[in-house]
Amino acid sequence: MIIGVPKEIKNNENRVAMTPAGVVHLINAGHTVQIEKGAGLGSNFADAEYKEAGAELIDSAASVWENADMIMKVKEPLSSEYKYFRKGLILFTYLHLAAAPELTKALVDSEVTAIAYETITVNGTLPLLTPMSEVAGRMATQIGAQYLEKSEGGKGILLGGIPGVSRGKVTVIGGGVVGTHAAKIALGLGAEVTIIDLNPVRLRQLDDIFGSSIQTLMSNPYNIAEAVKDSDLVIGSVLIPGRKAPKLVTDEMIQSMQPGSVLVDVAIDQGGNFETVDHPTTHDEPIYVKHDVLHYAVANIPGAVPRTATVGLTNVTVPYAVQIASKGAVKAIQDNPAILTGVNVMNGKVTYEAVAADLGYDFVSPEDAIKDAELV
């Protein structure tokens, strides 16, 4: 199989879907890897490194898309890339379709087989989402601390305080991978940290991890409102796999915050956790202000640390890519339940139930989509 890796074109997205090490892995499995020239430069991987690993360097993105049996990316295709979609193409990338109706329609209409990193599930975990969630969580606190500086428009708070001066208050909504790593960095900076989650079992786990160094609260409107009101930094990190993110922090809650406070919405890929966040921002223009509160809603936070993020991502994606390339999409889906859970669109059908529910499509299971195609 020919695996194509185009350069990412989303604003300031410097990650790349394949490292030279990943190229070697796929070539050793008997496949061809074509990389668009310059695709790895943002992550400090030179074209020469890919060539030495055995990849073919391709001059244009169009040729990469046209030649490939499977395209591997980091972020979802943008509208300028929809023209490359075609029946029989496998697309393996982050998709976040519940928040992307136009992309979903393009995938359905073109009959691409779209396998989403973020919904591949193993024993209740999301192994292809985890490394980027770790990066995004750690970055979220760093970013929030930066924008609390007065020069950035913040309220002039040092999260760790100093002797005789109170510490900054950080509230993390969602105690999953993102939230846990955000809390770790906030604690490391010396902040006063609260984690809010809906799952009492998870709250007990967090208490075991952090002990008495953090406060845990059950998620409900009252607790969220009280915590948000007193916070300097609020990080939204609640994700429901494949679905739109819940708007847990209301406009009224945000109006109760002090001017210069900061919100970081890590869930913006799926629509965001804050009612006042109605659009993603970019690394070029990361902040907007509403109710005198700074809103950071960049959808590709790990793109700011591309070397770390790229290596972490490809460590987990390439083994699945080898299976898909070696067996073909249908056989890989049939043989591996994890890959099955990643299939969001196939043969013109929406095959991930949460996406179908959010966007108003009829849900067709991947197994039935395969059968329907075989009957044609």
UniProtKB/Swiss-Prot annotation:
It comes from the Bacteria. Substrate binds at R15, K75. One of its GO terms (biological process) is sporulation resulting in formation of a cellular spore. GO terms for cellular component: cytoplasm; plasma membrane. Pathway: Amino-acid degradation; L-alanine degradation via dehydrogenase pathway; NH(3) and pyruvate from L-alanine: step 1/1. The active site is at H96, D269. SMART domains: AlaDh_PNT_C, AlaDh_PNT_N. NAD(+) binds at residues 133, 177-178, 197, 219, 238-239, 266-269, 298-301. It catalyses: L-alanine + NAD(+) + H2O = pyruvate + NH4(+) + NADH + H(+). Keywords: Cytoplasm, NAD, Nucleotide-binding, Oxidoreductase, Sporulation. It is an enzyme of class 1 (oxidoreductase). GO terms for molecular function: alanine dehydrogenase activity; nucleotide binding. It is found in: Cytoplasm. Its main location: cytoplasm. InterPro entries: Ala_DH, Ala_DH/PNT_CS2, AlaDH/PNT_CS1, AlaDH/PNT_N, AlaDH/PNT_NAD(H)-bd, NAD(P)-bd_dom_sf. Its EC number is 1.4.1.1. Catalyzes the reversible reductive amination of pyruvate to L-alanine. This enzyme is a key factor in the assimilation of L-alanine as an energy source through the tricarboxylic acid cycle during sporulation. NCBIfam families: alaDH (TIGR00518). PANTHER family: ALANINE DEHYDROGENASE. Belongs to the AlaDH/PNT family. Homohexamer. This is Alanine dehydrogenase. It comes from Oceanobacillus iheyensis (strain DSM 14371 / CIP 107618 / JCM 11309 / KCTC 3954 / HTE831). The lineage of its organism: Bacteria, Bacillati, Bacillota, Bacilli, Bacillales. The gene is ald.
